[in-house]
Swiss-Prot record:
Catalyses which reaction(s): CMP + ATP = CDP + ADP; dCMP + ATP = dCDP + ADP
Family: Belongs to the cytidylate kinase family. Type 1 subfamily.
UniProt name for this protein: Cytidylate kinase
Enzyme Commission number(s) of this protein: 2.7.4.25
Enzyme class: transferase
Domain of life: Bacteria
Species this chain originates from: Brucella canis (strain ATCC 23365 / NCTC 10854 / RM-666)
Length: 219
């Protein structure tokens, strides 16, 4: 009798900053009972490891060592969400060796499980190009800036909307034009523009696509 291995069911969610992909990914993971990995946190975790040891953020060898020793299950989203860590992460994220190490770790996470949800910038194009379902979540820069602005105010911090909008546009430019793994939808990704959608509406739209993919996956 022939034996066969069923490929893992991977939900790949990509999109620019503050598009709502993280919120959507967590909602999907909770609904389907799937493990979730926010791959953006892996770059932040590398940056924090360097900052904690007082090491240079410009040394690719040191950053790569930090990436290779990273424990994906020990990442604390609340701690890693600090603005200073995000700024530092943008420096290590452009290093090819760091990206290779983290992509390998992210890929291993996805392939070692029966099912999972991963969100980031290059899941459907680089990390898991064979994912069962790919979503590219986007929204206008103004809407994304407003969401980020409201998040900051909700934390009790002060924020400047114009500054947040300018920062998002600059980040989009950097993400879309970088040489290594530029931000772009996979050819077979489903586009989900959340500019005028509630979280619930976005989830229901995604759920319909995922349910269809699950049915096909199970044969």
């Amino acid at each position: 009798m022939k034996s066969f291995v069923v490929a893992p069911f991977i939900v790949a969610i990509d999109g620019p900053a503050a598009s709502g992909k993280g919120t959507l990914a967590r909602r999907i993971a909770t609904h389907y009972g799937m493990p979730h990995l926010d791959t953006g946190l892996t770059y932040r975790a590398v940056a924090k490891a360097l900052l904690d040891k007082g090491l240079s953020l410009d040394d690719e060898a040191l950053a790569t060592d930090a990436a290779l020793s990273l424990d994906l299950l020990a990442m604390d989203k609340a701690v890693l969400s600090a603005h200073a860590i995000g700024e530092a992460a943008s420096k290590v994220a452009v290093m090819p060796a760091v990206r290779r190490a983290l992509v390998e770790a992210q890929r291993h996470f996805a392939n070692a499980l029966p099912s999972s949800v991963l969100d980031g910038r290059d899941i459907g194009t680089v990390v898991c190009p064979d994912a069962a379902i790919k979503l590219f979540v986007t929204a206008s820069p103004e809407v994304r800036a407003r969401r980020r602005f409201d998040e900051v105010l909700a934390r009790g911090d002060t924020a400047d909307f114009a500054e947040i909008l300018a920062d998002l546009k600059k980040r989009d430019e950097r993400d879309m034009n970088r040489t290594d793994s530029p931000l772009r939808p996979a050819e077979d990704a489903h586009l989900l523009d959340t500019s005028e959608m509630s979280i619930e509406a976005a989830f229901l739209a995604a759920k319909k696509l995922i349910d269809h993919a699950l049915a096909q996956h199970r044969g």
